[in-house]
Structures are given as structure tokens and as C-alpha cells.
From Swiss-Prot:
UniProt record, GO biological process: ribosome biogenesis
Cited CDD domains: Obg
EC number: 3.6.5.-
GO molecular function, one term: GTPase activity
Entries under Gene3D superfamilies matching the protein: GTP1/OBG domain, P-loop containing nucleotide triphosphate hydrolases
GO cellular component: cytoplasm
Keyword flag Hydrolase: yes
Task performed by this protein: An essential GTPase which binds GTP, GDP and possibly (p)ppGpp with moderate affinity, with high nucleotide exchange rates and a fairly low GTP hydrolysis rate. Plays a role in control of the cell cycle, stress response, ribosome biogenesis and in those bacteria that undergo differentiation, in morphogenesis control.
Name of the protein: GTPase Obg
Keywords, sorted A to Z: Cytoplasm, GTP-binding, Hydrolase, Magnesium, Metal-binding, Nucleotide-binding
Cofactor entry: Mg(2+)
Membrane-crossing residue ranges in chain numbering: none
Domain OBG-type G per the UniProt entry, residue ranges: 160-334
Length: 370
């Protein structure tokens, strides 16, 4: 499955129907008076969150979504029919923003959450509304209002519990395929992963968590180098980060400590909050290290890396240590899930895009650089 995390669409609500300027024409009723009906309202465009959808790929191909116009009013007090609404189903976790103003329209965080993207125009008034004691045969009527038209950006932040960090070829794809149902492309060269992969790890009946594998980072990723920088935002909602390190690189000139340090540096440059997120060190590819050298190599790495957090030694290829790691992750998430949700709510509340301030002139959102 190819994972699409961003799309741009245009939504066009329906125009309201025009009111009717009609007079009652009936035998034996010489002064029938006005009987023009109102126009129907235009259809609106809605988005609804659907947990059964996990990509935005449909919106890469269907970029324009139009609701129906309202029908015009007619004589005999006939009101126009309202235009049909359009409902767009999107993955849970989709963020919808206006491309012209920068306004955050919605953050779809719950299944079946519904939000209006473009409101249909109201219908015009028929001449029936303009009748008065001094104007018994009004010819006035009003036209329907045009519907809203918007260019929207859809961004999907993966709702994963665990995020994988690491240099290209650190074994992240092998790890996620060994512990979950995800089947990413795996090969012995860097940048095998070109798009995020999601996997569900099950540690027992009704006990599971979601893990996300993003493209590997390289030095300079925070400034846009490599592939991983554009997917770092997926990790902002995870509860814990797993930093995978290749402890046995094929190229002997590669220093695992230097690579691990570079990853931490890029994380901090990209987002301080992401840097402060709980992070576990996972030393991978132990099967490539002679058994009598493993203890010394691990100790040397931890000493030079100056790491005092949780450490796990695994081989994603053989599965060694993976089960214990998964159980530890589940226990941690079960213990800290409430705190994680509360922290995420605080982050969303602090987001400038949620404020009630109007956008600055010129289309820039509050907080954007001029």
C-alpha cells in the first residue's frame, strides 16, 4: 500500500436558487396577489472522519468536489428544492486547512467526526415576502447567494503510538515487518522506505499498538536534506520514539555513535518538543556481531554515546529481543496513555491555527512569518 500523507483539493458549495416573482392567476380570483416561492439552498460540502480509511490517495486523483445548486422558486408558492450535500470521507488524523488564508478548518481526531468545509448559499426570496399594505402586487424578488469556494490542503498525521527513528538502512523496515502485519519494501541499500509504513503490533487478545516507520533521516534533514524530514511531523503524535542504531554497519568506517548523535541533533533542530518526547535506544543487528564481542561493543557504544535511558538489544532479522521490546512498549503505553492524550490536547490548544484571531491581511495565518 502506498501511503499518501498530503493532498490539495478544491471544494465548491452549491449556489442558492433564485426567488420567484409570480402572481396568482386563477379564474374568479381577479386580485390573487403574489405567490412566488423562495429558492432552495445550495448544497454544502462536509468532511467526515472514517477509521477504515488510512490514506489520502483518493484525493490525489479527485481534486474538485462540487455540491448541487438549489433550484429556483416557482409560482403557486412552490419553493425550490435544496441542493444535495457532498460528504468526503477522510482518514482519522487528517488536518484540513485553507490554502489561501492559512486557517485551520478541522483536525479529524475521532471516527465519524463531521465538519463543514464549504457552506451552500442561501436561497433567494420570492415576491410573496415583499407584499405589504401599500404594495399588494410586488415584483421584487432576490437572487440566491453563491456558495463558498475553497482551496484546501489535507495533511495526514499518522496516529501511531510508536515512531521509529534511525539512519537509512538501520533496519527499521525489517523490525516493523517482524513485529507487525506491515510489509514494507526491504533491501540492502539506503532509502528503501520512500513513504511511511504503519503496522499493528499485537501482544495479546485486545492488546495492540500502532507503530510507524518513516523514511530514514540523514544529517541535514531538518533543513530539508534526504527523505525523512517531510515525514517527521508523523512522529509528533506518537507516545514513544524508538531510535534504531545499526551496531554492525557493513562499512567499517561508519561510526554508529556518530550516526546516532546526528539523528538526535536533527531531531532537536526540527522540533524541541519532538526532541523531548520519550525516546528508547534500540541496538539492532546483534546477529552480525560475534557473540563474544557483543557485551563489549554495547558497553563501548553506551559509554561514548553517553546514554542513560532505556536500552534494548535486538536482531530484527532473527527476532532476538523483539518480543521483550514489544511487551515493554505496550506496558509503557498502557501506563502513560492518559498523560499522552492530555499533552497532545495542550499542544493543539496552543497551536496558533486554533486561535480565534482573524488571519493577517495578505493571506498569512497568525504566527506566520511575513
Amino acid at each position: 500500500m502506498k501511503f499518501i500523507d498530503e493532498a490539495r483539493i478544491e471544494v465548491i458549495a452549491g449556489d442558492g436558487g433564485d426567488g420567484s416573482a409570480s402572481m396568482r392567476r386563477e379564474k374568479f380570483v381577479p386580485f390573487g396577489g403574489p405567490d412566488g416561492g423562495d429558492g432552495g439552498r445550495g448544497g454544502s460540502v462536509y468532511a467526515i472522519a472514517d477509521r477504515n480509511i488510512n490514506t489520502l490517495i483518493d484525493y490525489r486523483y479527485a481534486k474538485k468536489h462540487l455540491a448541487r445548486n438549489g433550484e429556483n422558486g416557482r409560482g403557486s408558492d412552490c419553493y425550490g428544492k435544496g441542493g444535495d450535500d457532498v460528504t468526503l470521507r477522510m482518514p482519522v488524523g487528517t488536518i484540513i486547512s485553507d490554502m489561501d488564508t492559512g486557517e485551520l478548518i478541522a483536525d479529524l481526531t475521532e471516527h465519524d467526526q463531521q465538519v463543514m468545509l464549504a457552506q451552500g448559499g442561501s436561497g433567494g426570496l420570492g415576491n410573496l415576502h415583499f407584499k405589504s399594505s401599500t404594495n399588494r402586487a410586488p415584483r421584487q424578488k432576490t437572487d440566491g447567494k453563491p456558495g463558498e469556494r475553497r482551496m484546501l490542503r489535507l495533511e495526514l498525521k499518522v496516529l501511531a503510538d510508536v515512531g521509529l527513528l534511525g539512519m537509512p538502512n538501520a533496519g527499521k523496515s525489517t523490525f516493523i515487518s517482524s513485529v507487525s502485519n506491515a510489509r514494507p519494501k526491504i533491501a540492502d541499500y539506503p532509502f528503501t522506505t520512500l513513504a511511511p509504513n504503519l503496522g499493528v503490533v499485537r501482544v495479546g487478545p485486545s492488546k495492540s499498538f500502532v507503530i510507524a516507520d518513516i523514511p530514514g533521516l540523514i544529517e541535514g534533514a531538518a533543513e530539508g536534506a534526504g527523505l525523512g524530514h517531510q515525514f517527521l511531523r508523523h512522529l509528533q503524535r506518537t507516545g514513544v520514539l524508538l531510535h534504531l542504531v545499526d551496531l554492525a554497519p557493513f562499512d567499517e568506517s561508519v561510526d554508529p555513535v556518530a550516526e546516532a548523535t546526528a539523528i538526535v541533533g536533527e531531531l532537536r533542530k526540527y522540533d524541541e518538543a519532538l526532541y523531548e518526547k520519550p525516546r528508547w535506544l534500540v541496538l539492532n543487528k546483534l546477529d552480525m556481531v560475534p557473540e563474544d564481542e557483543r557485551k563489549a561493543r554495547v558497553a563501548d557504544f553506551l559509554e561514548r554515546f553517553e546514554w542513560d535511558g532505556p536500552v534494548f538489544e535486538i536482531s530484527a532479522l532473527t527476532g532476538q529481543g523483539c518480543e521483550a521490546l514489544c511487551y515493554a512498549i505496550y506496558d509503557y503505553l498502557a501506563e502513560h496513555s492518559d498523560a499522552h492524550r492530555a499533552a497532545e490536547a495542550e499542544d493543539l490548544a496552543a497551536d496558533v491555527r486554533f486561535r480565534d484571531e482573524p488571519p493577517a491581511k495578505g493571506g498569512a495565518a497568525p504566527g506566520d512569518d511575513a
